[in-house]
């Protein structure tokens, strides 16, 4: 655990930079985290995926893996990898301020 | 969980799938898909009987080996009864489906969509008389072992 400043607010993050408390999140933090991970600008499409991840997590208590993200988010797996080349489910969860999806698939 | 933050993170893996059974193919697919999900570059290389997983006629019909497979805990002579492999495969496939794992064809399509490279082995293709047309569209090429090593340069190689 470490404290870091994201979009002007001090938040607690884990070793991989995921927010510890999802309720501290806002969209400016998503943009700041994306920049750190090499995505300079979050487009509407990025935000669609990020908000979808966040809503799923809030509704179900866990974030979808890449397979169900491809099936249910309205964005195909191919496109997801174009949007988030370094791992769509992982990065979209991170930018959404929720825990990393758990599971092997 | 033990974490070693000092170690250099893995940035690329090349995974060889050489077995032609259901249980021989899944681990390599899970590792390739998992690598891409972590942002790690991945190549899949199908060789020998592993090529069935990317063969148009066989990829939907991969079976669990019921003979010579002590992990299954079925005596070899029982495992050899005709139809046993299909039965065990059906049981395992239904379990796999319940866990919401993709089937082998869906998994290979998915891995291809993640941007991983999928290749088949030239020596094996020659041995079985397969051409590119016999293999599913996700296979980008039939390559030599030398080309495989060139492609794998700078990453880890995993043989399954």
Predicted regions and their residues:
Chain A
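A short, ordered amphipathic alpha-helix with a cationic face
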Residues: 18-24, 55-58, 66-67, 78-80
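Generic, ordered loop/turn and secondary-structure boundary motif
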Residues: 7, 12-14, 20, 43, ...
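N-terminal first-folded block
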Residues: 4-36
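Helix-rich interaction surfaces within compact, conserved domain-sized segments
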Residues: 13, 65-105
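Metallocofactor- and cofactor-centric catalytic cores in central/energy metabolism, strongly enriched
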Residues: 30, 35-54, 58-59, 66, ...
